[in-house]
Amino acid sequence: MKFLCAEDNAINAEILEMLLEAKGASCTICPNGQEIVDAFASVKPGDYDMILMDIQMPVMDGLEATRRIRSGENPLGRTIPILAMTANAFLEDMQKSKEAGMDEHLSKPVDISALEQTVKRFRVTPPPRK
């Protein structure tokens, strides 16, 4: 699997990258919401399977970045799964994530087994080739 990730904390980004790579996945890390929006604008089918989005980031937060991805010109933005990964763990925070267009809300520190289960739920499996 290939992930496009937004994480402004360098240590958290490194840990996330190591966890994903240990599971055979790859990821591209963007340090703020504006950079992930810009990166997503040129994404083509098959480039990424899912977005992992921090909420509290400089320049543009994850909620606004999600809104822009969902409403942007790239049609993949309407369907790609976006998972919030954030220290904001209250019910109100989860509701804000959903309202912004996120599919799921995971609290930090992220439990790798919880992340795996969530990814499995939202993974889009391509149809078998004929």
Sequence positions of predicted segments:
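C-terminal compact regulatory domains
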Residues: M1-K130
